[in-house]
Amino acid sequence: MLVLSRKKDQSLMIGNDIELTIIDIQGDQVKIGLKAPKNVSIYRKELYLEIQEENKKAATADVVELDSIFKK
């Protein structure tokens, strides 16, 4: 993991088209601004992990249940 120090209003670039800016620092909370192309999905990690888990559940759907749905 690369660890960088930034102060309020300082930025860093990820690749050529993603800019991360430190907006505010209050105690142990840091507000971050992101500029990225619209085709780049940005999620908080905890939400991203939930999405992955739901996708795994959907991919392992009960075959018997699916078969009964399609026979209707």
Curated annotation (Swiss-Prot):
Belongs to the CsrA/RsmA family. This is Translational regulator CsrA. GO terms for molecular function: mRNA 5'-UTR binding. GO terms for cellular component: cytosol. Pfam families: CsrA. It comes from the Bacteria. The keyword RNA-binding applies. A translational regulator that binds mRNA to regulate translation initiation and/or mRNA stability. Usually binds in the 5'-UTR at or near the Shine-Dalgarno sequence preventing ribosome-binding, thus repressing translation. Its main target seems to be the major flagellin gene, while its function is anatagonized by FliW. NCBIfam families: csrA, PRK01712.1. Keywords: Bacterial flagellum biogenesis, Cytoplasm, Repressor, RNA-binding, Translation regulation. PANTHER family: CARBON STORAGE REGULATOR. Homodimer; the beta-strands of each monomer intercalate to form a hydrophobic core, while the alpha-helices form wings that extend away from the core. It is found in: Cytoplasm. The keyword Nucleotide-binding does not apply. It comes from Ruminiclostridium cellulolyticum (strain ATCC 35319 / DSM 5812 / JCM 6584 / H10). GO terms for biological process: bacterial-type flagellum organization; mRNA catabolic process; negative regulation of translational initiation; regulation of bacterial-type flagellum assembly; regulation of carbohydrate metabolic process.
